[in-house]
Amino acid sequence: MSAVNAQTKYDEGRLMQVLVAPIVSEKATMIAEKSNSVTFKVLQDATKYEIKAAVELMFKVNVKAVAVLNIKGKTKRFGKSVGRRDNLRKAYVTLQAGQELNLGGESA
């Protein structure tokens, strides 16, 4: 799916909301260096096709594959009160060979 096709198939306003935040951690950085992938926190109801279209639209790169992970929120205690962390949907976006996505904001 190309960036042009993504704009016509999906609502652009929805695509701008699909990607919530990039995930920057040791594991995400290791995966990024190893397999040319980027990790994002995405909306709970986002599909792989929407995630692919959103990345292609926002960052102007070609996406090879998208893997999605649902993480259940943990139950946490603070004294007598019991709380719960939110559920999380994580997307591993693999880019085509030769494509690069710089989330650091620094120019090369």
Curated annotation (Swiss-Prot):
Kindly state which keywords UniProt assigns to this record, in alphabetical order: Ribonucleoprotein, Ribosomal protein, RNA-binding, rRNA-binding
Organism equals Polaromonas naphthalenivorans (strain CJ2)
Looking up InterPro entries in the UniProt record yields: Nucleotide-bd_a/b_plait_sf, Ribosomal_uL23-like, Ribosomal_uL23/eL15/eS24_sf
Its Gene Ontology cellular component terms are:
ribonucleoprotein complex; ribosome
Q: How does it assemble?
A: Part of the 50S ribosomal subunit. Contacts protein L29, and trigger factor when it is bound to the ribosome.
The record's listing under SUPFAM superfamilies reads: Ribosomal proteins S24e, L23 and L15e
Q: Which gene encodes it?
A: rplW
What GO MF annotations does this protein's record show? rRNA binding; structural constituent of ribosome
Purpose: One of the early assembly proteins it binds 23S rRNA. One of the proteins that surrounds the polypeptide exit tunnel on the outside of the ribosome. Forms the main docking site for trigger factor binding to the ribosome.
Q: Which PANTHER family match?
A: 60S RIBOSOMAL PROTEIN L23A (PTHR11620)
- Protein name, as recorded: Large ribosomal subunit protein uL23
A GO term (biological process) for this protein?
translation
Family listed: Belongs to the universal ribosomal protein uL23 family.
What highest taxon heads this organism's lineage? Bacteria
Q: Name one Pfam family in it.
A: Ribosomal_L23
